[in-house]
Curated annotation (Swiss-Prot):
PANTHER family named in the record: GLYCINE--TRNA LIGASE (PTHR10745:SF0), GLYCYL-TRNA SYNTHETASE/DNA POLYMERASE SUBUNIT GAMMA-2 (PTHR10745)
Transit peptide: 1-24
Keyword list, A-Z: Acetylation, Aminoacyl-tRNA synthetase, ATP-binding, Cytoplasm, Ligase, Mitochondrion, Nucleotide-binding, Phosphoprotein, Protein biosynthesis, Transferase, Transit peptide
Lineage, opening ranks: Eukaryota, Fungi, Dikarya, Ascomycota, Saccharomycotina
Origin species: Saccharomyces cerevisiae (strain ATCC 204508 / S288c) (Baker's yeast)
Residues the record lists as Phosphothreonine modifications: 689
Matches recorded under CDD domains: GlyRS-like_core, GlyRS_anticodon
Amino acids binding ATP: 283-285, 294-295, 410-411, 538
Gene symbol of the encoding locus: GRS1
Protein name (database record): Glycine--tRNA ligase 1, mitochondrial
Pfam family, one: HGTP_anticodon
Binding site for glycine: 251, 302, 531-533
């Protein structure tokens, strides 16, 4: 009997045993994922064991909020960024820029970040321990609700649950003993309403909650100082003199705004248009926690869509208007509820729950992107910011929030920044950041205008004359109208000018303000900005959780069910053994995969195929290609699908085509493998003829 016949018989015996393994349908997979409860510790063990990421500077004890990505984590992040770039930049014809991370003080002072980019912190005056106020209130009230549940007999041991939760969250502080105390129903309702709105409280309001509900140091019970603002930006000095103060950027947006005129010119002065930027940003978090979810250095992908403030329609809105999403609008939250409303995007915009078509369009596109990269649709909602929760620059904002074992996490923001940024930078630099639209039909426009008697400015205001003049020439129409009334009534008015001490008085000899009607052939306006902003690290971690499950037949066998598009490695190439006759085929298949630019790994270790597949299931590798002794004979290989463990067989060329179609062309497993032969049936037939 020839070597190949012996090998064939040997392989068939292996396959006969493998026939007993259940091949799973899509429904089977869903049931299997639901059958085994999610275990965060097990996920983190897999992620760190397979070096998706690890604490930075671990040998030196690490630094809270800083992480390094290993090879699979780096590849996964790159694949998500590549998908993002194609989904947004290429599809929407956006203009990509890469701006510096170092930002001068004046830029961020003008944008409002120096004064307003803060979280609320409170300090234990005895120990010096610092807490983030909203997190502290949330943690204490949640603990009291758990104690109430134990007192009512709804849970067996609230302390065990709390300790388990603290361990999972890797908190270094101890968990104060939770007392099983039954709360009044009204108090329970109050706590639940507070927790539903926890992101919307100001510092003074958090202080009032801490005082009202006797919230102090959760370990010692000591009273804490009142919450105070802590600016989250990392300060630095630019240059050797140390005179030029700067910051590591807290967002990529400012670089895009400051390059607006160049971008508009590059786009042949056509609007609307969008710029985009992908890069690192930095925030000096008060209490980094929850792994990749709250860190001090993170990757962002941001879009600035510049649009006419009088026309926020979108030409492609009809393409997405029928998409149904879960919305959590402001009024629902104000009522103390967290139950989302399911509506189509078209209905949300028509009812003005979502302000305009462009904002609605990008919310829908965010949804489509998140679905593409592996987010669980049932764990996605769009929550509207409360009025006092919005960033200082935002007119409206919706967060794409993903549910994880840590709760609902803000991963994407979609804000209408109105014309705030361009307006403040234009006012500060005296450089117009506007769109000039040629009008088909000239229009008559009546405006307030101010005339200055400049020859009197120098003697009266001396060195401050340029500042006063600049302030007057940049006054809004409303300001000019009010000053005109004062000038008419009193013959004078006063103003406050940046950089000038006290109030500046001007009379009718120095200025004249009147309405004038002109015919305009060009409309000049500051565009509004719709900004989708993605926290890539938070999205990555959420996809980790949404993709993780254990096989019901063996809970120790973990799987990361990444979509093939974003999986770090697409193919595990598995020679059946280290026999020299399999080397040429393995080399040939590797060469074709490399030429096809399909990321792969060869595992020719001596362990069983099952173990090799299992450890790559933990890496999220969607396909396994097995090279056996039949492959050496007829150049056919077996293709295995990760989640269902289904296997098919065909020529090397057809198998690689199937991998490419499923990974990059959006084909399903059934569509991609329709020309391949189910492996088990073939193997059984072979076994019977031997």
């Amino acid at each position: 009997m020839s070597f190949f016949n012996i090998s064939r018989r040997f392989y068939s015996q292996i396959v006969k045993k493998s026939v007993k393994i259940k091949r799973m349908s899509v429904e089977d997979i869903k049931k299997a994922r639901a059958a085994v409860p999610f275990n965060r510790e097990q996920l983190e063990s897999v992620l760190r064991g397979r070096f998706f990421y690890a604490p930075a500077f671990d040998l030196y004890g690490g630094v809270s909020g800083l992480y390094d990505y290993g090879p699979p984590g780096c590849a996964f992040q790159n694949n998500i960024i590549d998908a993002w770039r194609k989904h947004f930049i290429l599809e929407e014809d956006m203009l990509e820029v890469d701006c510096t991370m170092l930002t001068p003080y004046e830029v961020l002072k003008t944008s409002g970040h120096v004064d307003k980019f803060s979280d609320w912190m409170c300090r234990d005056l005895k120990t010096g321990e610092i807490f983030r106020a909203d997190h502290l209130v949330e943690e204490v009230l949640e603990a009291r609700l758990k104690g109430d549940q134990e007192a009512r007999g709804l849970v067996e041991d609230a302390n065990a649950a709390a300790k388990d939760d603290a361990e999972k969250k890797k908190r270094k502080k101890k968990v104060k003993q939770i007392k099983a105390v039954k709360l009044d129903d009204d108090v329970v309702k109050e706590y639940e309403e507070i927790l539903a709105k926890i992101d919307g409280y100001s510092g003074p309001e958090l202080g009032e909650l801490m005082e009202k509900y006797d919230i102090g140091n959760p370990v010692t019970g000591e009273t804490l100082e009142s919450p105070r603002a802590f600016n989250l930006m990392f300060e630095t000095a630019i240059g050797p003199s140390g005179q030029l103060k700067g910051y590591l950027r807290p967002e990529t947006a400012q670089g895009q705004f400051l390059n607006f005129n160049k971008l508009l010119e590059f786009n042949n002065s056509k609007t609307p248009f969008a710029s985009a930027s992908i890069g690192k940003s930095f925030r000096n978090e008060i209490s980094p926690r929850a792994g990749l979810l709250r860190v001090r250095e993170f990757l962002m992908a941001e879009i600035e869509h510049f649009v006419d403030p009088l026309d926020k329609s979108h030409p492609k809105f009809n393409e997405i208007k029928d998409i149904k999403l879960s919305f959590l609008p402001r009024d629902v939250q104000e009522a103390g509820s967290t139950e989302p409303i399911v509506k189509t995007v078209g209905e949300a915009v028509a009812s003005r729950m979502v302000d305009n078509e462009t904002l609605g369009y990008f919310i829908a596109r965010i949804y489509q992107f998140l679905m593409k990269i592996g987010v669980d649709e049932s764990k996605l909602r769009f929550r509207q910011h409360m009025a006092n929760e919005m960033a200082h620059y935002a007119a409206d904002c919706w967060d794409g929030e993903l549910k994880t074992s840590y709760g609902w996490i803000e991963c994407v923001g979609c804000a209408d920044r109105s014309a705030y940024d361009l307006t403040v930078h234009s006012k500060k630099t005296k450089e117009k950041l506007v769109v000039r639209q040629k009008l088909d039909n000239p229009i008559e426009v009546t405006k307030w205008e101010i005339d200055l008697t400049k020859k009197l400015f120098g003697p009266k205001f001396r060195k401050d004359a340029p500042k006063v003049e600049s302030h007057l020439l940049n006054m809004s129409q409303d300001d000019l109208a009010s000053k005109a009334e004062l000038l008419k009534a009193n013959g004078k008015f006063t103003i406050k000018v940046d950089g000038v001490d006290g109030e500046v008085e001007l009379d009718d000899k120095l200025v004249k303000i009147e309405q004038r009607t002109k015919v305009e052939h060009v409309r000049e306006y500051v565009p509004s900005v719709i900004e989708p902003s993605f926290g890539i690290g938070r999205i990555i971690y959420s996809v980790f959780e949404h993709s993780f499950w254990n096989r019901p037949e063996d809970n120790a066998r973990s799987v990361l069910s990444f979509p093939p598009l974003v999986a770090p490695t697409k193919v595990l190439l598995v020679p059946l053994s280290n026999h020299k006759d399999l080397v040429p085929v393995t080399t040939e298949v590797a060469k074709i995969l490399r030429k096809s630019q399909i990321p792969f790994k060869i595992d020719d270790s001596g362990v069983s195929i099952g173990k090799r597949y299992a450890r790559n299931d933990e890496l999220g590798t969607p396909f396994g290609v097995t090279i056996d002794f039949e492959s050496a004979k007829d150049h056919s290989v077996t293709l295995r699908e990760r989640d269902s463990t289904k296997q098919v067989r065909g020529s090397v060329e057809n198998v690689i085509k199937a991998i490419r179609d499923i990974t990059y062309n959006g084909a399903s497993w059934e569509e991609g493998t329709k020309d391949l032969t189910p492996f088990i049936a073939q193997a059984e037939a072979e076994a019977e003829t031997d």
